[in-house]
Amino acid sequence: IITRNVTWNLEKPVQAYQEMVRVLKKQGHLLNIDGNHYYHYQDQDYSRAGHSDHQHMEGIDVSIIDNIAKELKLSYVLRPQYDIEILKEIGFQQIESEILSKEKTKEGKELIRQFLIHAIK
C-alpha cells in the first residue's frame, strides 16, 4: 500500500491503518508519505514558523480547508511518532521512518514538515 499526503486528512486515521494491516498479506509493505500539515494549531513553534501549505492555491478560499483541518485528530499530534506507535499497536512487525523535509527555528528546534514511514506486516 502506498499513500502520499492522505493520512493527515482522515477523520479516523487509526481505522484506516487497521484496514491497511487487514488487507496486507504477511510481509506486505506500507509506504506512507505524509506530514505535520496543520500541526501549527497545536504547537507555537510551528505556528511562528508559518506554513506554506496554501501558497500553490492562489485564488482559492482556503478557509474551508482550514476549518476542516481544525477538526482532524492528526492536526494536533506530532508525527511520525504518533503513527509509529499506532502501527506497532495494530500489528506491523517492522517500522522505519525517515524525515524528508524539516526546518529549524531560530532557537534550533527542528520542525518536521514531511516524512516517510515504511512498515512491514
Question: Which ranges hold each PLM region?
Answer:
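A conserved beta-strand element that flanks and buttresses the S-adenosyl-L-methionine
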Residues: 2
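Nucleotide-sugar-dependent glycosyltransferases with a strong bias toward membrane-associated enzymes
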Residues: 10-13, 17, 80
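A short glycine-rich, Lys/Arg-flanked "PGG" loop and its adjoining helix->strand segment in the class I
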Residues: 14-29
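C-terminal lobe and adjacent flexible extensions of AdoMet/dcAdoMet transferase-like proteins
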Residues: 90, 115-121
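A short, glycine/Asx- and small/polar-enriched loop/turn
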Residues: 109-114
